[in-house]
Amino acid sequence: MMKHVIILVILLVISFQAY
């Protein structure tokens, strides 16, 4: 489950940086 959470966090960070 940890890996899934990390992936979600990374995606959110990338989205914020791109935005």
Curated annotation (Swiss-Prot):
Family per similarity comment: Belongs to the Ibs toxic protein family.
Official protein name in the record: Small toxic protein IbsA
Transit peptide in keyword set: no
Transmembrane segments: none
Function as written in the Swiss-Prot or TrEMBL entry: Toxic component of a type I toxin-antitoxin (TA) system. Overexpression causes cessation of growth.
Note from the entry: Part of the SIBa repeat region (formerly known as QUAD1a), encoded on the opposite strand from the sibA (formerly known as ryeC) RNA.
A Pfam family per the record: Ibs_toxin
Organism encoding this protein: Escherichia coli (strain K12)
Annotated InterPro entries: Toxin_Ibs
Expression triggers: The sibA sRNA probably represses expression of ibsA mRNA, either by destabilizing the transcript and/or preventing its translation. Expression of the proteinaceous toxin is controlled by antisense sRNA SibA.
Disruption phenotype: None seen.
Record keywords: Toxin-antitoxin system
Superkingdom of source: Bacteria
Gene that encodes the chain: ibsA
Keyword Glycosyltransferase attributed: no
GO biological process: programmed cell death
